[in-house]
């Protein structure tokens, strides 16, 4: 840990550096591990450098001590929650097979009681994908979430657990199902919640319509900047590819900067662009999608090209559907007006349609 934090901070030139803890479940490492992490970060940070901390957790182990630590160190929490109880508990069970919703909600209330900032990370899967508005309204109205990420579950059906094969498990979300899920929530959000609730894929999409680079690697032309470090110092090309063939090396044996800048890692990032099928290159929504995450590019195009994203049909219908309102919000921004004005514009349009 000392070696990684020292090397990571020394390699940064930006005035603000983010240290992110995720797993597995990071809280299993115990609170002392994170206290030590902060101690090292404060020790090695450069003059004038600000350190931001984030943690992705399922929330089941949180208590007052954890929440005091988060508040004292201004840790931004990403809380894994898949919607109302019956949807969350469909797949999020503990090692004994017991449901976890009540424990997660207890953790959420502790975060709120201690004034800890949190985002919601919701997996979209077979158990909740058919109930988009119920999921969204639960987050918005019941728990008061202001920042929401939706992560589509695309899980390969194999024995290795690696990104191999072209079959998916029964709990994976369907492509068209995911597109419909996003469209239903977008219709609610764009009429009522712009500027009040931040949904990551909507914000990223707006950036694409404005012509700005995506903040998400999955919607960028190339990738390779979301490396994964294991507790033993092993560094992998991506947190979706923690597999032997994507091992770059160990930071205890070779400097972090050297591993990040290897030809192997550079090729990994460029492969996203270089292997993009012609079907995608000629697509009208390529500017917003860029082929999606490489981990999901395992089906064929209608013309038989390999490397099409499993979620293509869903992404395509979603990006096509949001084109007009996104173009309107992009125009508002270019004229130094708030994107939230779209709500009044659509309200007026909807009234005219009613007559």
Q: How would you name each of these model-derived features?
A:
Residues 2, 90-102, 109, 113-218, ...:
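Radical SAM enzyme [4Fe-4S]-AdoMet core and its adjacent flexible, acidic
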Residues 231:
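A cytosolic small-molecule/anion-sensing beta-strand core signal
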């Amino acid at each position: 840990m000392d070696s990684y934090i020292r090397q990571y901070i020394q390699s940064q030139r930006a005035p603000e550096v983010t240290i992110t803890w995720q797993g597995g479940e990071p809280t299993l490492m115990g609170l002392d591990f994170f206290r030590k992490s902060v101690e090292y970060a404060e020790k090695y940070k450069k003059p004038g450098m600000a350190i931001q901390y984030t943690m992705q957790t399922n929330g089941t182990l949180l208590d007052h001590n954890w929440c005091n630590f988060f508040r004292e160190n201004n840790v931004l929490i990403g809380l894994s929650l898949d919607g109302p109880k019956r949807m969350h508990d469909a797949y999020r069970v503990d090692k004994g097979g017991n449901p976890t919703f009540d424990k997660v909600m207890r953790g959420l209330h502790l975060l709120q009681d201690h004034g800890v900032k949190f985002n919601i990370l919701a997996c979209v899967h077979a158990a909740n994908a058919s109930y988009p508005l119920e999921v969204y309204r639960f987050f918005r109205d019941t728990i008061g979430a202001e920042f929401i990420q939706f992560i589509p579950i695309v899980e390969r059906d194999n024995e290795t657990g690696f990104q191999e094969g072209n079959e998916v498990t029964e709990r994976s979300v369907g492509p068209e199902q995911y597109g419909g899920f996003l469209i239903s929530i977008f219709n609610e959000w764009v009429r009522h919640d712009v500027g009040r609730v931040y949904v990551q894929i909507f914000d990223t999409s707006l950036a694409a319509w404005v012509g700005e680079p995506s903040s998400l690697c999955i919607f960028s032309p190339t990738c390779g900047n979301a490396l994964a470090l294991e507790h033993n110092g092993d560094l992998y090309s991506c947190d979706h590819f923690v597999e032997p063939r994507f091992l770059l090396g160990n930071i205890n044996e070779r400097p972090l900067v050297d591993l990040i800048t290897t030809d192997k890692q550079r090729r990994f990032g460029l492969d996203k662009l270089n292997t993009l099928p012609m079907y995608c290159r000629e697509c009208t929504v390529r500017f917003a999608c860029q082929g999606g995450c490489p981990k999901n590019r395992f089906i064929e195009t209608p013309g038989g090209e390999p490397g099409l994203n499993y979620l293509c049909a869903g992404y395509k219908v979603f990006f096509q559907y949001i084109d007009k309102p996104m173009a309107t919000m992009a125009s508002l921004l270019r004229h130094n007006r708030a994107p939230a004005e779209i709500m009044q514009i659509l309200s007026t349009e909807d009234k005219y349609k009613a007559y």
